[in-house]
Amino acid sequence: MSNESKCPFHQTAGGGTTNRDWWPDQLNLRILHQHGTKSDPMDPDFDYAKAFKSLDFQALKQDLTALMTDSQDWWPADFGHYGPLFIRMAWHSAGTYRIGDGRGGAGSGQQRFAPLNSWPDNVSLDKARRLLWPIKQKYGNKISWADLIVLTGNVALESMGFKTFGFSGGRADVWEPDEDVYWGSEKVWLGGDTRYGKDQVKAQAPGQGDLVAEPAKHGEEQNRDLSAERNLENPLAAVQMGLIYVNPEGPEGNPDPVASGKDIRETFGRMAMNDEETVALIAGGHAFGKTHGAGPADNVGAEPEAAGLELQGLGWANKFGTGKGGDTITSGLEVTWTSTPTQWSNEYLNNLFNFEWELTKSPAGAHQWQPKEGKGAGTVPDAHDPSKRHAPSMLTSDLALRFDPIYEPIARRFKDNPDQLADAFARAWYKLIHRDMGPLARYLGPEMPNEELLWQDPLPKADQPLPSEQDIAALKTKVLASGLSVGELVSTAWAAASTFRGSDKRGGANGARLRLAPQKDWPANQGTGKVLAALEQIQGEFNNGGKHISLADLIVLAGTAAVEKAAKDAGYAGNVQFRPGRVDASQEQTDVESFAVLEPLADGFRNFTKARYSVKAEKLLLDKAQLLTLTAPELTVLIGGLRVLGANHGGSKHGVFTDQPGTLSNDFFRNLLDMGVEWKATSGDNESFEGRDRKTGQVKWTGTRVDLVFGSHAQLRALSEVYGSSDGKDKFVKDFVAAWVKVMELDRFDLK
C-alpha cells in the first residue's frame, strides 16, 4: 500500500464540487465581502495615510535610485539598469484600469495576486517585485506595495534623465485577489474569441470567467475574420485574455500597423487616454529598455500560480541557455528601440520615421520589424554583451504611430518638438499611475503637483462657514414644507450620491454635479430637475441671509430630512447623521465625456433600467452594490427601505409592497415573504411579475427581478427574513439609516 493511500483524507476543506460548479449562474454575493478583517493582518487601528506621512520619502527615493544600477546575478539588469523593467512593472500595475467600471488599476497592489501575477503580459514582473523586496522590507508598513510599485516606476524615469510631473501616495494594500473584476470569459490565456464574438454578452456582471493556461503562440494568426467589425466587449480594455492592452504583434498576431492602431485607440481610450496621451505614452515608454524573446516560448515554464513550491512564488522558469540575461524570454519579441535605452531621448520617434521598416521574426518566431537594407546596424547596444551591437527594431504596435492617420501627425509633431513630447509624456504618465485614486483629498506626499487637472474631477475649496445645527434644523423644516414628497427628496439624494464608484473613487454627491451636464440629462435622473429647482430656491433664500449652504449639502440634507420624517411616521424618533462641508463644482470643472461613463445603465435601487440587457437585472444590481462598497445586508436593507419610501424611477409601483408609501416600515420584506401571495411572470422575458392573493386571485403587488430576488436567492432571503420578522422592525430602521448615511458620505474623503 502506498503512503498516499494511507492518508485518511481524500480531500481537505474547500475542495470538491462547489455551489458555483453546480449553479454557475448563481449570484456571487462573495464579491460584496472582499478584503475584510479576516484577510487583513494589520491591526484594526492601522492608518496607512498616517504611516505614509511618517515615511522618510527622500531616503526611500535614494534607495530606489541606488537599486536601479545594483544588478543582481540571479536576475541581471539589462544594460546595467533596472529602470526599464520597473517602468514596465508600474505601467502594467496601473494599466489594468478601465474607465467603464473603474475597476483594475494600481490602487491596491493587485499585481501581487492572481490572475494578474500570472498574466502572460506580466512575465518577469515577478522578478521586478522580488528586486524590490529588500526595500519594502526596510520601510515596512510605511509604504504599501501599491504605492511602492508605482513610485519605483517614477524613480526609474527620473534616474534615466526624465523629469516627471509628480507622485502622490495613498494607495492602501489589500491582502487577497479581487473577485469582482471581469477580465473576460475566455478559457485560455491570450484568447480573444468571446470578447469579439458575434454573440458576445454586451455587459457583464463582475467576477465571472475561469482560466486555464495555454502555451503562447507567436507569429500565428488566429482563424477569425479580422475584416469583420471588431466590437470589444464592455467594460474590457484589452484585446486578449492576459494582455494589458494590445497584442504587440498586431491584432491576433496579424502584423498590420493600421489595424493595430485601431486596437490601440480602442484600448487606450477605454483607459481614459485620448490620442495625444496615447502617442505620448507609447513614445515615452519605448524610449527605454527592450523586449525579450531570446528563444522559443516552449522553453518557459509555468506561471507563478502554477509553479512548484520550491520556486517560492516565482514563475516562468526558463531553460533556454542561462534562463536570464541575454537568454531571457518574456514576450517572445526581441526589440530594442533606441541606442540609449537607459537615457531619456527622442530617438524612438526619430528611428520610427527616419527608417523604412520590413517585417522579420524574433528568435522566438514573433512578428517584429527591422530597418530595410540593413540600415541602423551596429547602432544599438546589446543588453548584456558589450562586444555585440544591433540595429534598432520595432513592434507592429510601434509602427501604428506612423501609419495610423490620426496618430501619425501627433507622433511627427512630437518628433520635431521634443519638449512637447516630454511635457505630454510626463502628464500622461502621471494620469496613468493616478487615474484610479479619486479626488485630491486622497493624495499624499511631498511631490503632489500644485496644478489641478480636469480628469481629477476637481472641486472648489470649502472656504465658507458651515451651517450651524440650528441652521440645519431650519433648513430641514423648509425642505419638508416645500411640497416635495419623501420619495422625490430621497430619490434625488440617491441619484446624486449613488454615482460613486469604490473602484476608482469617482462620483458621489460632493460637487452637486447632478445639476450639470451630463448628469442632468441622464434618463435615470428624470424628475430630479423639479427637486433641484425647489432646493436651489431654498438655498438662495438661506444664502441671501448672510449664511451659506452648498447645493451639494442641501441635496443630501433634503434626502436625510425625508428619511427622518419617514422614520418618525413609522414611530421611530431620532436624527439621521448629516455632516456638512460639501461644495458645488462648476461646469468648467466637469469633463462631460469623462463623467459620461458614470451614467447608470441600470440602478436596481431605483428599479431603473435604461434598456434591455443580456445580463440579468439582479446581476446588474449586484455590480452596482459592489461599486457602492455595500455588504449583502446593506444591499438588502437599502432595497427594502428605498422601495417603501417611494424612490423608484418615474414613480413606478414595482416593488412598493406597502399600503403606506413614504413611511419607513419593513413592509417590503413582510409582504415579499408572505406565502399567501403567489408570483407569476407577466412578461415573456421574465423581467416583470405580479403577486396574486392565493385565495382570491386578486393582484396585490407587482415587481421586477430585482425585487423578487430577495425572496428567491437563498442568502438574500435569509437576510430578508431578519428584516421581515416581527422583532426586525427596529433593526430595519437602524440598519437602513446607517446604510443611507454610508452612501451619502462615500465620497467624503475630507472626513476620513
Curated annotation (Swiss-Prot):
Which InterPro entries does the UniProt entry name for this protein?
Catalase_peroxidase (IPR000763), Haem_peroxidase (IPR002016), Haem_peroxidase_sf (IPR010255), Peroxidases_AS (IPR019794), Peroxidases_heam-ligand_BS (IPR019793)
- Swiss-Prot/TrEMBL puts the cross-link Tryptophyl-tyrosyl-methioninium (Trp-Tyr) (with M-271) at W91-Y245
CDD domains xref list: catalase_peroxidase_1 (cd00649), catalase_peroxidase_2 (cd08200)
Q: Tryptophyl-tyrosyl-methioninium (Tyr-Met) (with W-91) cross-link position in this chain?
A: Y245-M271
Q: Where is this site: Transition state stabilizer?
A: R88
Q: Which positions bind heme?
A: H286
GO molecular-function annotation terms?
catalase activity; heme binding; metal ion binding
Cite the record's Basic and acidic residues compositional bias ranges.
215-228
- GO terms for biological process? cellular response to hydrogen peroxide; hydrogen peroxide catabolic process
The reactions it catalyses are:
H2O2 + AH2 = A + 2 H2O; 2 H2O2 = O2 + 2 H2O
Query: Its Enzyme Commission number?
Result: 1.11.1.21
Its PTM note reads: Formation of the three residue Trp-Tyr-Met cross-link is important for the catalase, but not the peroxidase activity of the enzyme.
The annotated active site, in chain numbering, is H92
Record keywords, A-Z: Heme, Hydrogen peroxide, Iron, Metal-binding, Oxidoreductase, Peroxidase
Q: Where is this region: Disordered?
A: 1-21, 204-228, 366-391
GO cellular-component terms in the record? cytosol
Cofactor note, please? Binds 1 heme b (iron(II)-protoporphyrin IX) group per dimer.
PANTHER family hit by this protein: CATALASE-PEROXIDASE, HYDROPEROXIDASE I, BIFUNCTIONAL CATALASE-PEROXIDASE
Describe the task this protein carries out.
Bifunctional enzyme with both catalase and broad-spectrum peroxidase activity.
Q: Which family does it belong to?
A: Belongs to the peroxidase family. Peroxidase/catalase subfamily.
The name this protein carries in UniProt is: Catalase-peroxidase
Specify the species: Pseudomonas putida (strain W619)
Organism placement in taxonomy: Bacteria, Pseudomonadati, Pseudomonadota, Gammaproteobacteria, Pseudomonadales
